[in-house]
Amino acid sequence: MTRIILFLNECVPKMIATATILVIAILCLEWYRGWKNRQLKELKKGSRKKAHGIIFGKLGIKFVFSPWDKEGHVGIFAASGTGKTSACLIPTIRSISEKHVKSYTYAIDISGDISKNCPDVPYKLEYAPEKPDTPPYNIFAPIDALDEIEDKYEALEQLAFLLMPEKVNMNDNARFFLVNGRKILTASLIAFYPVGMDFISICERIVQSSWQELFRDIDNTGNIDAIRYINGFEGANEANTAGCKQSCDDALKLFATNGKIKRSIRRPKRGEKSVEPKMIEHSNIFVVIGEDKLSLYAPLMNILTSQLMEYVGTRKVTKNSPCILLCLDELASLHIDGELILDGVRRFRKRKCRLILLMQNTADLNILYGADVTRAILANLKYKVLLGGTGLGEPESQKYFAELIGYKDSTKHSTSSNAKQTTHTESEAKEWVIEPAELDRQGKDTVILIAADEPDGYLKLKKNYYFKR
C-alpha cells in the first residue's frame, strides 16, 4: 500500500503536468486554426484606422471590408440617391489613398462628386471634357506605342469595333448597316492614321464627306490595306452604301461635331500631360461628366473605359505591379460592350484588377446585354451589395437577390377539427430568409452584403457615409 501511495505521489503530478501541457497545446492549435481561417477569409472587420480596400459598411463599431490586395469583383445595386458613391465608392477610394497602399483607381465620376470628396488622393489625374483646361485624352496613344505597322492596323480595326459595337437583339437589317459601316470606319482609320491625322480630324473628314468623296480620298492615299475594306462596296446598291456610311456617321457624330469633345481629345503637345490607358499604372484617374450629359457623352465614356479595360486585359503583371480598381458608376449608361465586361469579371483577377460595377438593378443589365450575358456577369461578381432606401424597385431583381440569400427551415402548424376530435399537425417547410419584396424595406441606412464566404451567405450592415466620420 505504501508503495502504491509513493508511486501515485510521484506519477500524478507528472500526469497532471502532461495533461495540462496537452490541453494548452490543443487550445493553441485551435486558436491558430481560427487565426489562420480569419487570415484566409477574404472579408475583414476592423477599426477605421485598419480598414483599407473596398469598404462595404459598418457592423457595430467595426468596418467590414475586402482588403485592396485581395480578389473578387463587386456589384452595387440601388436606386439613385441611396449612397452608392457616398457610402461605398468615396470611403473605398479614401481608404486606399490614406493607407498609402500600392493601388490606383479609375472612376467614372458623375457630376464630379467622387473627385471633389477625395481631395487627398495622390497622383490624381482628372479628365473633365467640359472644362477648358482639362488634360487631353489621347485615343491614339495605345496605337502610337506599337512598333509594327501591321500591329497598328490591327489596333485601328479593334478601335473601330469599340466605336461601333453590336447591340443585343439587333435585327439583320440593322446588323448589315452596322457591320458595313464599321468597314468604312476601319478603312478611314487605316488610310488617314499613317499620314499623321489625329482622331478628331479623321472623324471630321468622315462625317463631313459624302460616301463617294470619302471613298475617293481613301483611294487617293494608295493604302492597299485600307482600300480592301471598301472594295466590297463597288457595284453595290448606292442607297445601301449611303445607309452604311450613315451608320458610321452616327457613331462618330459626338467626336466630329461637339466642340468640347473635339478640344479635349487629341495627342498632347510637347511637355503636356495627357490621359491614356497606361497612366493607370501610376495615377488615380477620374473621368468627370455632368449628370445631364451622361446620355450625350455615352460614346465617349464607352471608348475611354473600353480602351482602359483592353489595356488591363493585356498588362504584364509582376509581384511589384500595382493593384487596379475600376469603378464604373451608372454602368447601364456607359454602353460598354457586354463581352468586354464579361471578359473583365472573368479574367482581371490574374491582372491584379478588381471591378466595382454600380447600377440600379439587374434589369438594366438584361436590357443592355441580354439574359445570358447578364447571368454570366452576375455569377462572376463575388460580392453583391444592396443599399436600403428606395432600393431595387424591380420584382425580378428582388427575387434574384432573395434567392441568393436563400431559405430557412421552418415548422408549420395546422389544426383541423370535426365533431369527434381536434387534430394538430406539424410539417417542415422552407421560407425566405428575406422575402423578395422586403429587400426594399430594410431601412434607408441598411446595407445587405451578399458574400458566399460568410456563414449565413450574407451580412446586414449599416451604411458608412464619408461625411459621417
Residue ranges and their predicted role:
Residues 48, 55, 59-62, 390, ...:
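Compositionally biased, intrinsically disordered low-complexity regions
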Residues 16, 133, 364-365:
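Short secondary-structure capping/turn micro-motifs that flank functional sites
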Residues 4-11, 15, 146-149, 417-420, ...:
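Extended hydrophobic/Leu-rich segments
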Residues 345-347, 351-448:
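Conserved ATP-driven motor cores of ASCE-family P-loop NTPases powering translocation/secretion/packaging/pilus
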Residues 30-31, 36-44, 59, 65-353, ...:
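P-loop NTPase motor domains
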Residues 3-53:
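Charged, amphipathic alpha-helical linker segments immediately N-terminal to NTP-binding catalytic cores
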Residues 1-3, 449:
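Class I SAM-dependent DNA methyltransferase catalytic core
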Residues 9-11, 128, 361, 464:
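Low-complexity, intrinsically disordered/propeptide-like segments
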